[in-house]
Amino acid sequence: MATVNVLNWKKEKVGSVELAADVFETPVKKEVLHTVVQWQLAARRQGTHMTKTKGLVSGGGKKPFKQKGTGGARQGSSRSILMPGGGTAFGPQPRSYAFVLPKKVRRLGLSMALSHLQKEGKLFIVDSMASEGKTAELNKRLQAFGLKKAVLVDSVVDDKFNRASKNLPTFKYFPVEGLNVFDLLKYDAAVITKDSVAKIVDRCSLEKA
């Protein structure tokens, strides 16, 4: 169990907190992270693509030309997949790309992503995310940490902080419930509040899976 500093927004130490080893010191396996990211992205896909089969194309009730004497192959319908404007054989149809991934694997992936940031020194614990709701103020805070893009995680959503962060496209703010592997890997760093640490540990607990 590692003890890390709790910082204010001037990057000054204001306390300390212990990080559970089974969540923030998990050995990283790329194949697990890859699987979890695939699962997330698959669930986001709309899957509304569709091509018309022979039975859905309009027209084609009449034989397009006589059986013999044309020098070409015989055809019984202009809707045939062999005809220009005809149907498509085995084309994409509406479907869901989502698949089931065990909770244990999802929780393990989240622990690995957090452990990776912790190992790289890109995980920061702050005392609070209370804000005046001004983007300029928040931008100044983030510059003190030298961050160009990061996820900002709070135990509960602060409306003013949320409003200020929406004008910063390279930063993403959400509560612990929204914490996910894809965003942790996409952004350079993570800033989480001291109060959210316990909730994160609870989310990543393999005993609950």
Swiss-Prot record:
Keywords assigned? Ribonucleoprotein, Ribosomal protein, RNA-binding, rRNA-binding
Any single GO molecular-function term of the entry would be:
structural constituent of ribosome
| Gene Ontology biological process terms in this record | translation
Q: Where is the signal peptide?
A: none
List the InterPro entries hit by this protein, alphabetically.
Ribosomal_uL4 (IPR002136), Ribosomal_uL4-like (IPR013005), Ribosomal_uL4_dom_sf (IPR023574)
Q: Partners and quaternary state? A: Part of the 50S ribosomal subunit.
Query: What is the designated name of this protein?
Result: Large ribosomal subunit protein uL4
Q: Which organism is it from?
A: Bdellovibrio bacteriovorus (strain ATCC 15356 / DSM 50701 / NCIMB 9529 / HD100)
